[in-house]
């Protein structure tokens, strides 16, 4: 069969599958009755840490740099929960940390806590059975964002093609809010590799524990997604089998070397939270997020709200912008804006993954195709080394770092003029700019911004990253006295793959 004929047949099948889908195009959710809750242990605890007197500093923050911090504080919040837990993630892995956290959510539900979990569909990987088992609990409700109508095998991807403009838009937001009082937002998903627990790859990542006025906006964002027409109850997606609670048996507690035990009960949770709250900084902050459903899903040329906000903050910078992004891709218009800033004297430094530290060659290819242009437009580039010293500093466990375990960058942060910091789910690439929904916490505080700037600069040092330069029209990688004219610590096959992918018109989708 000729190639064009095969392509035509595929598209016809996709259209048929899309038209015969078993899911409605959207859900009209009934309005839920408002429930007023009294004070909780967390709200009483938070009240004890209110600022002395400030009309602007109404939000308290503490950065979560290590995987232990990120998992321990989430678990402490769950153990202390009394009324509600609202969770929104792009990925929730069915691994040690993912299963254990799920088991503690069930324990919270057993004591009467209302648990709501919102997950994107693209990475469910046929785990509807497990999620339906959790959803069967009377106090647990799980919804899936923007699911494919066909759930299994090759036909799933055909249905994806049949409704590409809608299904290509993914929910990348991340939040974890308990009793409407404390929340965790940032770059991490739920899974071993985000908590320094994986034996395959671990990520440098960053979240923020927040309390105060901005939590109301985070909660509003969650409800907007929860009630959106692209939000589907998980029991609509699976088969009609009885939910099997044995799917969440055999739960083990994750173990860290050289860190305290994770909080396993209310007493240790309260103790940890008191310690953490005492270390929080009161700041002026705002939480920005994209709307869940675009007015026109076919329009992929308009930047999302989070992209516009970050672009505005960049344009207002006078001295320096420090970027840290797992994926880094700018289009021609954005590059011209960076060039204008550079011409005005703004120093722009960006840290991203090297090919050797990136777990996705496809994503790296989009960056590699724009790398020369970025350097030419005044952006100083740094690429993370896979054996970065940052890993051991975070994990305190050499077995979780290279060469035994791969190490990559997943953080998404930026510092403007060492006075404003942004931490969130937004990668500085075209998918975050035009397609995904994202969320960011903007912190206006010089102490926090300076601390984050120093953390990013440390990651850019020669112990941790390669520095890139243009010489005679070619890109070179530098580390101390050494230099390379091709991507360090990579093979020809990887570079060939990347080069081939750069020829395809898929830059916006990576």
List the predicted regions and their residue ranges.
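Charged, low-complexity intrinsically disordered terminal segments
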Residues: 20-116, 120-172, 178-510
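Bacterial N-terminal signal peptides that target proteins for export
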Residues: 1-9
